[in-house]
């Protein structure tokens, strides 16, 4: 029996981000819906054709989404919140966009659905909303329409459907509390209807995604899989698909299910292939995810051939990507600025399709010629292990020399706080911002001109200096207590540091979707990380020279730089994080020498880096916290270390937040009405806190009374002497008019509280 290969999904946005541009044009009213639909059809046809030409046996259909595939599933099931429903009950493309964005060219604006991370990736999905007694019906035919499209084009296809249990797991209850799992029997008839429609079209296999099976699920949720799949069996063959981690701990549940195949992720997970092969019913197809869908590295096909060949003939086998290629850039061939050595180490989505074809061909017809092909393909991986671009002996030596004391400040917080009060003499309720100020068209144009050689270094620095000066003048005029330089020189909080550290490379077109039309271009960590020279000191020192008030030095923390980059695969994430920490430790020391007394080390991704299974959290948090402390602990007692985190769940990691031992932590709290601070109160968090007093994601200007009320509420949880006053996050995406007005109101609210306290 032949071993087929398949992908679990393909990037949607297009090589030149065509989907993003078409979406934003439509939203702005500059193009019609038919023009947008035409772009979608063209992209789908191109991507199916590209996969087929690369040698993929079964192309996925249903992986395309206008905004997000979980949102697409909500519409498929007719799950549209009342605030977004059309008067006639129909669902259209603008319904989808209102759910995703809060507004669309037609229909009334209303609050968008909540957005959160898709498992442990940097992709975001729109959270389904569930109400007690909710009804479901087949409401959106996108999947069936796209199957018809692909079949008409002559492709061998495998429709992709998010499974019912994972769909419910990913959602949230709204209104009267109830168990959302109780809705399972209500959504199953819609799934049955969809599968029946696919069977009518001659579909043999359906990829039904249940990634929740890699989690440590409550028993009630595990018990739900058997009745769910009992209801879905019999119409088409079901490939139960898991990814991002192992499934071995849920094997007892899995092997009782009436499905015809199982896909496992052998890259993100560490399941023993032999154990799986023995444990699963012999008639089942076993699909092995061997090509990493989440990274950019060339696969070691020789190694995979050795691992997989013993299974050939033992059962029906497929090979595939570990997960959807959604998380990978599209095509390496258009990267013209990467040097050939580094380029030979990479594979993007199209190249990964070629890897599948090469490996499946070798497994189907092994022999000396095929082995030579695999060895030749894998040769750059072996060469990379010896490359001077990868290994820096000094970094290794420095890492090996780390002691426990290197991660500890000289004195405990209480003693440091006294030294810092004496140094800075700040008022009660000190005011500050998180770091960035509005990135105007002029600022972005300056950076682009400099990057493309249209502006020389001297003129660039002069222009950036003027913008920094403007930011300082604005802050002094507003009456802020601790200032920032505004980050005019930075395009992105991770990319800026990656560009100035050895061990990183950057792509021209390595875009991946983050959510909706937003795409990011992560740096790639290719080798040992070091800092050849100071990165931020020049600008921080200049900004400090313009004012008598303290100016914060601004760094992105090691865990965030790691999480928002494509990491190496030949060393652990812990090693990478600590290499970054050592490089930035030198930056802290240099900032101190330049007279900067307050240094902020942002770690918004600390929680995002958590493993999927809670039993694995402790090991991660130990090294993640240690990396932050290694970065910060070189600071003197009277240097105040700030950190910023912008997520909304602290309760289960409060021990680790406290263990960071930052002198001040600023957090995102305005949208939760300060409720997040209860976790800090219950934990008796000992250090200083700046709860965000207004939401920077909205152009709305908060009133003085609103901010004052939030701060009073904050003071019920945290002693006033340990409270700071600041926005939720950086102001990069805002305009100057609302920024000035919002900050003026914030400063006035703090002044009122000081007067009342006096």
UniProtKB/Swiss-Prot annotation:
Residue ranges annotated as coiled coil are: none
GO BP:
methionine biosynthetic process; methylation
- Active site residues of this protein: 697
Query: Which Enzyme Commission number(s) are on file for it?
Result: 2.1.1.14
The family database entries (InterPro entries) matched by this protein are listed as: Cbl-indep_Met_Synth_N (IPR013215), Cobalamin-indep_Met_synthase (IPR006276), Met_Synth_C/arc (IPR002629), UROD/MetE-like_sf (IPR038071)
Pathways involved: Amino-acid biosynthesis; L-methionine biosynthesis via de novo pathway; L-methionine from L-homocysteine (MetE route): step 1/1
Q: Where does Zn(2+) bind?
A: 644, 646, 668, 729
Q: How is the cofactor bound?
A: Binds 1 zinc ion per subunit.
Any one GO molecular function term: 5-methyltetrahydropteroyltriglutamate-homocysteine S-methyltransferase activity
Domain of life, per UniProt, equals Bacteria
List positions binding L-methionine. 434-436, 487, 602
Catalytic activity line of the entry = 5-methyltetrahydropteroyltri-L-glutamate + L-homocysteine = tetrahydropteroyltri-L-glutamate + L-methionine
HAMAP family in UniProt: Meth_synth (MF_00172)
Q: Which PANTHER family match?
A: 5-METHYLTETRAHYDROPTEROYLTRIGLUTAMATE--HOMOCYSTEINE METHYLTRANSFERASE
What is the protein name given in its UniProt record?
Answer: 5-methyltetrahydropteroyltriglutamate--homocysteine methyltransferase
Q: Which organism is it from?
A: Serratia proteamaculans (strain 568)
Q: What is the name of the gene encoding this protein?
A: metE
